[in-house]
Amino acid sequence: MSVDKSPVYNVKAIPVEKIQANDYNPNVVAPPEMKLLELSIWEDGFTMPCVCYYDQEKDNYILVDGYHRYQVLKTSKRIYQRENGLLPVV
């Protein structure tokens, strides 16, 4: 079995401006939990990539999984700066 068959082995750093949230996100996270997620990403970095698919027509990525990590990168100035505005994506 070749390990390059699974997307997890091909993490890419994508500018957050090229990522679009999908229209459907059933999860609602309360502000205290979002603050904890922001703190966790600040202290430990991104430990899981977000899942996206590439839309060739629009030349952007549509977010499938990882909406709250995406939101943290977009809204936390310190994390955005440290990560150079790049989100880990498979």
Regions found by a protein language model. Give the residues of each.
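N-terminal leader or domain-start segments enriched in small/polar residues
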Residues: 1-40, 53-58
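A short, basic-hydrophobic beta/loop patch
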Residues: 4-11, 46-90
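Short, basic/hydrophobic alpha-helical segments
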Residues: 39-47
